[in-house]
Design a protein with these regions (language model features):
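Terminal accessory/targeting
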Residues: 1-47, 62-72, 188-231
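Active-site beta->alpha N-cap acidic-glycine motif
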Residues: 22-110, 114, 118-125, 133-134
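A cross-domain feature marking catalytic cores of carbohydrate-active enzymes
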Residues: 48, 75-77, 99-101, 139-141, ...
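Alpha-helical scaffold elements within enzyme catalytic domains, especially in hydrolases
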Residues: 63, 89, 128, 151, ...
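Short histidine/acidic/glycine/proline-rich micro-motifs that form metal-
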Residues: 77-80, 103-106, 142-143, 165-170, ...
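Charged helix-capping and loop-helix junction motifs
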Residues: 116-119, 175-180, 207-210
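Basic- and aromatic-lined ligand-binding clefts that recognize polyanionic substrates
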Residues: 128-152
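His/Asp/Glu-enriched short active-site or ligand-binding loop at hydrolase and phosphoryl-transfer sites
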Residues: 143, 148-185, 220-231
């Protein structure tokens, strides 16, 4: 009985360990992972996950244009195919577009063939709208484990994560002022900031964006795209 209990305990600990490896934003089993830039330079990379949506893409682009700030948009391939005009607008405004998978399904327990299909289809969809810049990759939900890092490493592709995610830290009930205040005070040089702005229930995050930009600029921060982030 003790032996069975020990085996069960070991299996539980292994499962917990694998879960933590899959969720880590700072480490993966193989290949390159970037979650922040040079900590000695007051630069920050503003990144948005998911979408695009026609309504909110235009709103976000207007905010960025008003404050003359570049950003990196990690887009879902199937929505890129469905809403090419929104993607083209992002490209025309000079922002960077990243690959956030085609289906936005978790990629941790998938075959290499399935993973490559997701990557290739999304890259092709992004290129189809005329975007010619670099396409970085961020996994859906930040989940990785073994096969995804293996495929990315084999293809000489880097995993781009984040170092500051105010929505995750504060929860969904946080107000725009709370999100802005927290982000401005928590930001460190070289941070990669993650925000989700493309959903109807994220009004408070969109409302916080101008405050975040103004607050960080007042502290001397410069905004860059991921590909221009000093490492």
């Amino acid at each position: 009985m003790r032996r069975i209990s020990l085996i069960i305990l070991v299996l539980i600990l292994c499962a917990i360990g694998l879960r933590e490896v899959s969720r880590s934003t700072t480490w993966q089993i193989m290949g390159d992972l970037i979650h922040h830039g040079d900590r000695n330079q007051k630069v920050i990379a503003l990144t948005f996950d998911d979408g695009p949506t026609a309504k909110y893409t235009a709103e976000i682009l207007e905010i960025l244009k008003a404050h003359q700030v570049p950003a990196t948009f990690f887009l879902i391939g199937k929505f890129v195919d469905e809403r090419p005009q929104s993607v083209a607008q992002i490209a025309q405004h000079g922002h960077e577009i990243g690959n956030h998978s085609y289906s936005h399904k978790r990629m941790a327990l998938r075959t290499p063939a399935w993973i490559r299909t997701e990557l290739i289809k999304t890259d092709q969809a992004i290129r189809h709208v005329g975007y010619t810049g670099p396409i970085q990759f961020r996994p859906p939900f930040g989940r990785k484990l073994l096969m995804l890092p293996y495929v990315l490493s084999s293809d000489n592709r880097t995993t781009y994560m984040w170092s500051l995610a105010p929505e995750a830290d504060l929860g969904t009930d946080a107000t725009a002022d709370q999100i802005a205040h927290y982000t401005i005070n928590a930001t460190k040089p070289g941070d990669i900031l993650l925000l989700h702005l493309m959903y109807s229930h994220r009004d408070q995050v969109r409302a916080a964006l101008p405050q975040i930009i103004i607050g960080l600029k007042s502290q001397g921060y410069t905004f860059v795209t991921l590909s221009n982030l000093p490492l």
